[in-house]
A protein has these predicted regions:
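Active-site substrate-recognition loop segments, prototypically the cytochrome P450 B′-helix/B-C loop
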Residues: 1-132, 141-159, 163-165, 172
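Conserved cytochrome P450 K-helix E-x-x-R motif and the immediately C-terminal K′/meander segment
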Residues: 250-287
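Cytochrome P450 heme-thiolate "Cys pocket" and heme-binding signature region
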Residues: 310-376, 384-389
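Cytochrome P450 core scaffold surrounding the K-helix E-X-X-R motif
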Residues: 303-311
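Cytochrome P450 catalytic core segment centered on helix I
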Residues: 148, 157-207, 211
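Cytochrome P450 catalytic-core helices
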Residues: 214-221, 225-250, 330-350
Length: 389
């Protein structure tokens, strides 16, 4: 799952897995790191909703993992909602949900526009751009900094730490980068509170310690930057390559909302995640799952499971792209709004935008967890800058 071959065509790999193994597949997440990949939809729902038998706490597992394992920064235990179980999970989850629920979605709509327009103006007169490095990433980064109340100087260090985590840099180095930057943010927000997630986490009755606060913010950025950037880019790829979205098929062209819903079903940006660790050997679908070995939900493969996939995506929210059960994403409304608005801003400004190469020439970044393009070159008629109000 970490190979370039898998990244190039994971759906072929999932089909072969299903043919050979059924709903549960033995895989390696990294060389010498075994796991079970869940590719059956109903099996995934069952496991995700059974935290007593399948907790998300990896501490026993990681004792057997070398410190230099490249996926350790992604999976190691942290005192946050994503990597905890039981009462710990409930405490962290309540604090995170309250902090996220405090986001003003109407104001967020305006915030996306305020970021998108200046970004578009940096390349609209060139007639060409890379939508990953020049639009999707900087927009996602700026919006998340705004939501977190994070100034640009601290945010730059956070972005570096996040990139290091997804690229498999040494766990101690990743944690040092994050720890320093996010401690600075927490110190700032204690002195200058605002209408932001960091301030709300600080004020929550859970009374989170500094290390806990840092790790809630690690989750915010980890679940935000890379997956949200990829959601935008992959949806744009669908809209730029499928004739339906270009209005070349009779009838009304599907909307950005339709494209997002379809993409979340067919090719979700966080393709394999929702990791749990069985407390004891557990028999599922005739397969014994070893105790404390990672069980990874393939949201991508499960969504495309022939048992449930009928090709109807309109107002269909049964996909697993946001996860399900007690660890389901609490910020899906925020992510959906940001992606929808960012895509609309770009296509409204540059309606004749198209890929600068054929889709099969695009390079997908290797990695067991994400579905991510390395670059997304586009061309368009040169356009004057947009007016910023």
């Amino acid at each position: 799952m970490y190979s370039e071959e898998f990244a190039t065509d994971p759906h072929h790999a999932y089909r072969e897995m299903r043919r050979q193994y059924g709903s549960l597949v033995p895989v390696e997440l990294s060389p010498g790191v075994p796991a079970t990949l869940v590719i059956g939809y109903h099996t995934a729902v069952r496991i995700s909703n059974d935290p007593d038998h399948f907790p998300a706490d990896p501490r026993t597992w990681q004792q057997s993992v070398p410190a230099d394992c490249p996926i350790l920064p992604m999976l190691e235990w942290r005192p946050n909602a994503l990597r905890s179980a039981g009462l710990e999970h409930a405490r962290y989850r309540q604090a995170n949900a309250a902090a996220i629920d405090g986001i003003d979605l109407h104001a967020l709509h305006s915030a996306v526009e305020e970021v998108a327009v200046p970004l578009i103006n940096t390349f609209c007169e060139d007639g060409a751009a890379d939508l990953i490095s020049q639009y999707a990433f900087p927009l996602t980064f700026a919006v998340l900094n705004s939501i977190a109340g994070c100034p640009p100087d601290i945010g730059q260090q956070v972005a570096y730490g996040m990139a290091a985590m997804f690229e498999g840099v040494d766990a101690d180095k990743v944690n040092a980068i994050f720890g320093g930057a996010l401690f600075d943010l927490i110190t700032l927000k204690r002195a200058e509170p605002g209408d932001d997630i960091t301030t709300r986490l600080l004020a929550h009755p859970a009374n989170l310690a500094d290390a806990e606060l840092i790790n809630q913010l690690v989750t915010l950025y980890g679940a935000g930057i890379e997956p949200l950037q990829n959601l935008m880019a992959n949806t744009l790829l669908l809209m730029l390559t499928d004739p339906r979205f270009a209005g070349n098929v009779p009838g009304a062209a599907p909307s950005t909302k339709d494209a997002l819903n379809e993409l979340l079903f067919t090719d979700p940006p966080l393709a394999n995640f929702s990791v749990t660790y069985p407390r004891q050997p557990t028999l599922i679908d005739g397969v014994w799952l070893p105790a404390h070995q990672p069980v990874v939900i393939s949201m991508s493969a499960c969504n495309n499971d022939p048992a449930i996939h009928d090709g109807d995506y309109t107002d269909n929210h049964s996909h697993l792209a946001w996860g399900t059960g007690p660890h389901a994403c609490p910020a899906k409304s925020v992510a959906y709004l940001v992606a929808n608005n960012a895509i609309d801003q770009l296509l409204d400004a540059l309606p004749e935008i198209r890929l600068a190469c054929s889709a099969d020439q695009l390079v997908w970044r290797p990695g067991a967890f994400h579905r991510a393009l390395a670059t997304m070159p586009v061309v368009f008629p040169k356009s004057p800058p947009l007016t910023v109000f």
